[in-house]
Amino acid sequence: ESDNFSTDRPLEFLQYDHHQLAKSDFCKFLGTPRSIFYEKSELDKREIAVQNTTPSELIKFMHEDVLDIITPILARIYTVTTPKQETFEIPAIVQTGAKLYEEVSDLNGIAIPCMYYDEIQRKWNNDNRSVLFDMILERFITIEKPHAYLKEAVEKVSETMTSITDYLYGANVYKAIDEHYYSKLRQIDVEQCTWLSDEDIEKCKLRIHEVISQDCESNKPNAEFCIIHNSEEEKHQAIDQILDDICPDNLRFRFTARVDLETDNYIYELKCTSELSLEHRVQVVIYAWLYKILGYPEKTFRIFNIKTGEMLTLDASIEDLSMIMRTVVKGKYTNTKRLDDDEFLQSQETQETQEM
């Protein structure tokens, strides 16, 4: 009633807990009664920013300090399973209607594998819809306000893709959606998607078949297998825990990662380029790291270059994969301090010790 003397105490109802108040006849208790109260951390009180990303986006423009650390590891964890063979003379640069020149190796690398995927998928079912069409549709429906030009381009894509032109145009549309960049799509219209011949396609499909077919005899392979999507919060919990100490307090990553082909024993990433690059290797490392962290069945990851016949196999511990993944993420989204000579030598000694 008052606070004038040491013996004064609050009125009895002021000492009630949630459950007592809920049972009282003088109080209308709203909400759920609680007995235990936790103090919110500063992180809980701040709004968490979400960064949606993909392995392809992570590996763009890697800092030289990042390359200094990961290059020796990459050299150690990849082995050449099949050395380079005859290099196919597949057009990599084409002239557009505007008399400009565009690099199309990336489009070849999408279109040619999808032709093969459709061929083997149709052996298992009667669905004539192309894998590439589904890839385009899946990406397109996630765009909140697609540009009118992009809508028109998607409407031109063939659902069944019965010609080389259909696949090349579909690859161009897919790339535009994936990279949010429409320059190549504007330069190369559907009528200009004619740079690959039937002979080019047949020899490429034969080369893929010689590598993959034996692992597709018992079970249907999964083309464009999704390891994780940025909407899958539960899957990201394990990732958050591992990357927590290198991320800004209010930033969390949400990954979308799809591998080209999953078979009984292998995960394949297919390329169609003159040379497999360091970026290609890092991309597959990120796929493998996500795959292992999420507890998928053990499988071997491979990179196969359709143009040269070269195949690399990844053989890495989770420690190696995590070192590369953490280094790439840290270099991409946090401020990095350039290593001086002593620090760089120390990092190399640490890696050599781990290898022993």
Regions found by a protein language model. Give the residues of each.
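Metal-dependent nuclease catalytic cores that hydrolyze phosphodiester bonds in DNA/RNA
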Residues: 1-258
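Generic low-complexity, intrinsically disordered sequence content enriched
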Residues: 15-18, 294, 349
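A generic signature of intrinsically disordered, low-complexity regions enriched in glycine/proline
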Residues: 122, 138, 170, 182, ...
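Solvent-exposed amphipathic alpha-helical surface segments
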Residues: 211, 215, 294, 331-335
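Nucleic-acid nuclease catalytic cores
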Residues: 243-326
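Intrinsically disordered, low-complexity terminal regions enriched in charged/polar residues
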Residues: 314-346
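Compositionally biased, intrinsically disordered low-complexity segments enriched
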Residues: 347-356
